[in-house]
Amino acid sequence: MSCLTYAQAEELTEATSNNVLPTIKLEAQGNWLEDTNAEKVQKHAGARTIITRNRLDEVAATSIKDALKQVPGVQVQENNGTGGSDVSLNIGVRGLASRLSPRSTVLLDGVPLSFAPYGQPQLSLAPVSLGNIESVDVVRGAGSVRFGPQNVGGIINFTTRAIPQEFAGNVSLTTEYASGTDQVKYSPNLFVGGTLDNGLGLALLYSGTKGDGYREANNKTDIDDVMLKTAYQITDADAIALNLHHYEGYGEMPEGLTAEKYAQNPYQSNKSRNYFSGRRSDVSFRYTHQDEKNNFELLTYYIDSFRTSDLETDVSTTTSRMDTSPRDYKVFAIEPRWSRAYQLGNSNSEFTIGYRYLDEDSSEFSGRSSTYALNAPVTEIKARTTSEGGTKAHAIYVDNRFDLGNWVITPGLRFESIETHNNFTAYNQGVAVNTVSPKIDSDEFLPSLSVMYKATDNWNIFANAGVSFGPQQYNQLARLEGGIAQSTTDGLHPEKSNNYEIGTKYLGNGLNAELTAFYLDFKKELILERDAQNNGIWTDLGATSHKGLEVGLAYDFAYLTDALEGLKLYSNYTFTKAVAEAGDFKDKDLPFYSRHAANVGLGYKVNQWSVNADMFAQSKQHSPGSGDTYQTDESADGKLGDIPGYSTFAVRTAYDFGEQFYGLKIAGGVKNVFDKQYFTRSTDSTGGKYVG
């Protein structure tokens, strides 16, 4: 059960509430991710969805995962394995791997969320909290020119709450209660800000998560996420903004269960020492200039992040061992971009050129104890591997939007030049054995072309094609094999994918609808597997293909008749077929995605009351392993075998007391009305079955 209480001094109005497209004028659009609204989505010649704060309130989202389930093509995995806490984020787009979200460019106000965008793009630490978010913008197609490098899974940008013109503030508290284990989790949120007469704007944002999940033990979460936003309007055309952001997260990680233990009690957890923690501090500065024809932006940022984990593994029925993995990362980048609108004959067009320089450093340690008796004190941790890596990357991109009557044609080209190195050392009981120093240089041209036909003021048809690129990460340059450090640059390679879309969108008369067919073609894709010593080993999965259909729909019934004012429908459905095109598993489904996923909901608001009901469903998934046989039957350790599909129902009601009670609102709901029990699996070092 989930309930929400908060007091609010001022409500921010949703920019798209009227669903009206303004008159087109000659003006440079500039940053695609700035001031996102329904109009920008409609003009984008690719699959794109924006979830606003109002929509998040309507669907009673209590987490980033809940928010992303509203987006067609996006599948969210429940907490599991080493991504088994609320500190991490596991999302997969169009059948791509979801563990720690490795194949999408995920941003917060345009700044990368991952530890290191090139060398360590995973989100085992996902420094973003729902309470600080104004909107979620998911660009699934036609975005690879502007953003990278990991963009085959699209671009996901979380926009934080804007600095208001007038002083405003609110506080809120969300409480989640797990009926199966009587566990309680709290999420306090604070927002206060305004703009002074001299044009200086300030805002303080805080969002936290405290308490326990739904497992019986070892699932405590403690998250603090704070941001100070400043902005100053220098002139009518020039503005600067400075954001300071700090995130700290601690999450205990219940282990995966064997099939036998899961049958006994799926909520049990017997590994009290497993946890993940991390912190991130980042600062970003942005200068913008916008006049009648020009839009210039300079963004620079610095990120300092740290993460560590302790993972206990049973070696036998009587002994265990401990693995620990502290890691440090530092990132600096500068990104100038200039757009200019111009007329070509009777048509409006826009040229954009942008550049990014990014420098990142990583320092990683992996240690392991000797074996010890179950529940005995942990023995001394000794080094197994160390890694000192770094990347210097230059990216330049150009695109040009040609408005030719009802046609909009945008060719573009991105060039990535990347130098990555990693000094990787193997140890035996803390004594250095050998060091390898692999390096890889990548120079990649990534072309794209998008075409849109404006059939009416409200309806358009689009198609696009582009090339996406994923550079080799630090842990893909070297590995531990037989106790020896070995370079893998001869056996592995960067990933490339050819991406295609065709679709249509409609916005107007209360209806917001999108339909997209997609196809992703990997010549070679990499996959993370485990060896007998539980080391993570990157190998070639080979050629894969991802194809499918996405549907999104939202409708305001007030446009039908006044009698239905306040009634709204929202839904999405995705069909995905992601299969191997080579190897022993040719034509078989890739691991951990559902061919079918759907979400449908109704919201009704009358006077001060609002009621929402929604259903989420997904079809079965597979965890086939990496042997010679595609395994569908459950293994004894719970890691392998099919995962049944499931559906859940949720209801929520809320009451707005109005301004006479200082904007107080109270809401309550049930997320899983029929108490449906479902599970997922994990194949990593703490793998097994995980109850949902």
For each of these PLM feature ranges, what is it?
Residues E248-E252, G256-Q264, D359-S369, A373-N375, ...:
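Surface-exposed extracellular loop regions of Gram-negative outer-membrane beta-barrel proteins
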Residues S172, W338-A341, G345-N346, F351, ...:
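Gram-negative outer-membrane beta-barrel transporters
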Residues V111-R140:
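Short acidic/polar hinge/loop motifs at secondary-structure boundaries
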Residues Q8, R99, G193-T195, R327, ...:
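Conserved C-terminal beta-signal and adjacent last beta-strands/turns
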Residues D182-P254, Y275-R286, R340, H394:
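Transmembrane beta-barrel wall of Gram-negative outer-membrane proteins
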